[in-house]
Design a protein with these regions (language model features):
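Bacterial N-terminal signal peptides that target proteins for export
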Residues: 1-9, 19
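Short, hydrophobic/aromatic-rich segments at coil-to-beta transitions
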Residues: 40-46, 61-68, 117-122, 140-147
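An acidic-aromatic
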Residues: 52-103, 156-157
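A generic structural motif
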Residues: 48-50, 68-70, 85-87, 124-126, ...
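Short, solvent-exposed helix-to-loop capping segments enriched in aromatics
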Residues: 37, 98-110
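Gly/Pro-enriched, hydrophobic low-complexity segments
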Residues: 112-188
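N-terminal leader/targeting segments and the immediate start of mature chains
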Residues: 19-53, 60-62, 72, 167, ...
Length: 193
């Protein structure tokens, strides 16, 4: 599951002495981007993870997500349960989302340092799962690139293209059930490595 989890990190943000003004400007601009994403009823986009793995991500408010990768793996959430499914191993992770803040706002919140240069945001923190996040947005404040760097230097980069917003997405897409023959791992994100 560990190798699969960084790919979930779908959807790159962005600091010192000139700090307070940069941080406030960066936070304000970042909040505007998060507000834009939160205002969308739905979206669909093509994604490329680390320059290789491709897929399609679909989102419907509130908190419904479905990602189908080119290798058959699926990440899906109806807002209450998050599934990770790998058809090669027939293993499915089932994560209870009760009490979890999600979305772009959840990923980008709590960073001590936020700076912005043009359309590139940089967020840094020594206490977060990702020590650095870079977010590049388009002219209409939709994500183009999200790069997340952990303290062990592992980097996950997600590039978005062909984003379509406020499209009709049926609820059934987000009610994923793995094949009955799958091995289910309960709450894999709560387990210690």
């Amino acid at each position: 599951m560990r190798n699969f989890l960084p790919k979930f990190s779908i959807v790159l943000l962005f600091s010192v002495q000139t700090g307070i003004l940069w941080a406030e400007d960066g936070r304000d601009r970042l909040n505007a981007v998060i507000g834009k994403m939160n205002s969308l009823e739905s979206f669909r986009a093509s994604v490329t993870v680390n320059g290789g793995l491709t897929g399609v991500v679909s989102y419907k408010s509130p908190n419904q997500l479905h990602v189908r990768f080119s290798d058959g793996r699926i990440i899906s959430s109806n807002g209450r349960i998050l599934w990770f499914y790998n058809p090669d191993s027939s293993i499915a992770g089932k994560q209870d989302l009760k009490g979890v803040s999600g979305g772009l706002g959840g990923l980008l919140s709590g960073y001590e340092n936020v700076s912005v240069s043009g359309r590139t945001f940089r967020l840094t923190s020594n206490t977060k799962r990702y020590n650095e996040i870079i977010l590049v947005v388009s002219d209409n404040d939709l994500p183009r690139v999200l790069k997340m760097k952990r303290s062990d230097e592992e980097i996950t980069e997600v590039a978005f293209s062909g984003i379509a917003t406020n499209i009709g997405l049926g609820t059934g897409l987000f009610n994923f059930q793995p094949p009955t023959s799958s091995q289910i791992v309960e709450n894999p994100l709560n387990q210690k490595e």
